[in-house]
A protein has these predicted regions:
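Anion-binding and metal-coordination hotspots
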Residues: 1-291
């Protein structure tokens, strides 16, 4: 495995899914370390929807899964994706791609000097190429901050499905999107932290992917048993202490209820101040966190 900020060596990756309500592990999928995180993502969502008859409203993951292809496939499943933000790579001292504004009506980019980068072609990898005129770039006062010594004109690439990525990015910046992403660190991040610190998943105890898969599955089973016991214990305690809260959720106390795709928002009074969970027509439906 060769990744920035990660140790180099032979590793396995545990692609885990938890529900956003109780932090129950719903899927464990182990791959070699040279497999990109985004490769099995949508496949694991579909597998769980078919196997457990899940009807999630949204999925959330870190920036490693924030690709145009995944956003398109998640959208086609009728889901909303809330992913971490990944900045486009740029050279030190040079303008990043965020400095160039895309105008969808004209299908052009506008540079900081208000010059157009027009569409030229689409390459075999599915990226549209936008180029500025060489004559304009050669006379630009900010040429040193924009081009390298080998470039004669500015060129940008945009994936053909980039619009889906922009759509999910807009939702992630909304109040609903922020609440979902905030919940992510309390679920999937906590689940992995417990696995490493309390259950020995920081290291492989056996060789081979089959043995590692067995270790990951057993670890997930133990964590789920502990979580289920804790949830049932809280439910029994809650029933004893309050007879007036039977209609409320036994897993999370919420400050508000919200749903996606144009559903109306409704507010609930609650002094506890826990984050929101997805609601549809008054019934809780899950959203998934994959890592």
């Amino acid at each position: 495995m060769h990744r920035d900020g990660k140790p180099q060596g032979f590793f396995y990756l545990d692609h885990r899914t938890v529900d956003g309500k109780c932090n129950i592990i719903t899927d464990v999928y182990v791959t070699p370390g040279n497999i990109n995180d985004a490769t099995p993502y949508v496949e694991r969502i579909i597998t769980q929807m078919e196997k457990f008859n899940f009807e999630p409203e949204a999925v959330s993951a870190d920036a490693g899964y924030n690709t145009s292809v995944i956003c398109k496939e998640v959208y086609d499943l009728g889901l909303v994706g809330v992913f971490g933000y990944r900045r486009a790579p740029s050279q030190k001292g040079k303008f990043s791609k965020s400095k160039f504004r895309y105008i969808p009506e004209w299908d052009v980019y506008i540079c900081p000097q208000r010059c157009y980068l027009e569409y030229k072609t689409t390459n075999r990898d599915g990226y549209k190429e936008y180029k500025a005129q060489k004559q304009i770039c050669s006379q630009c006062p900010q040429r040193e901050s924009c081009l390298t010594s080998k470039q004669e004109g500015k060129m940008l690439q945009r994936h053909i499905w980039e619009d889906y990525k922009d759509l999910f990015r807009t939702f992630a910046l909304s109040d609903e999107g922020k609440a979902i992403y905030k919940r992510r660190k309390e679920t999937i991040e906590r689940s992995f932290a417990d696995s490493k610190e309390l259950h020995g998943l920081r290291y492989c105890h056996m060789r081979g992917i089959d043995s590692v898969r067995e270790q990951c599955l057993l670890t997930a089973a133990v964590q789920n048993m502990k979580k289920i016991a804790l949830v049932k214990s809280r439910r029994n305690t809650k029933r004893k202490t309050s007879r007036n809260d039977r209609g409320r959720s036994i897993f999370l106390r919420t400050t508000s209820e919200f749903s996606l795709f144009g559903q109306m928002k409704t507010q609930k009074e609650n002094p506890s101040g826990f984050v929101s969970v997805l609601m549809v027509s008054g019934l809780q439906r899950p959203f998934l966190f994959l890592e």
